[in-house]
Design a protein with these regions (language model features):
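Intrinsically disordered, low-complexity activation-like regions
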Residues: 1-18, 23-121
Length: 121
């Protein structure tokens, strides 16, 4: 389960970087991560490994999923990084830095945001 989540969530991001395909496995990775958490697999792992189960939550463009991610990452070294992601999702409902790759039109506010430091990951 952990290995499959890593392959779907992390490998696809790196193998297909700068293409829409980089995000194509996100729904499946999130579904597997949700199931792993439901079954308590994350609680049986060291936090350094459990973090990889939680990463699909961080990569999601859903406000609801980020509410869950905030709780999952609480107390972990990745917590502040999750909060940085959540702020963007709360503000825009998506990651503006993905717009061009995914063929989405950016709003004027998103375009302004993209000129700011740390607007992308």
């Amino acid at each position: 389960s952990l290995a499959e989540i890593i392959v779907l969530d992390q490998f696809s991001r790196n193998i297909y970087r700068n293409t829409a395909q980089a995000f194509s496995q996100d729904p499946q990775a999130l579904s597997l991560a949700q199931r792993a958490i439901e079954l308590g697999f994350d609680k049986k792992l060291p936090s350094s490994q459990a973090a990889f189960i939680y990463m699909p939550f961080m990569h999601s463009e859903s406000k609801v999923i980020h509410q869950q991610a905030e709780q999952l990452f609480k107390g972990m070294s990745n917590y502040e990084f999750e909060l940085k992601h959540k702020v963007i999702i709360d503000r825009f409902g998506r990651y503006p830095h993905r717009n061009a790759i995914l063929g989405r039109e950016s709003t004027p506010e998103e375009l302004q945001f993209l000129t700011e430091p740390n607007s992308s990951f």
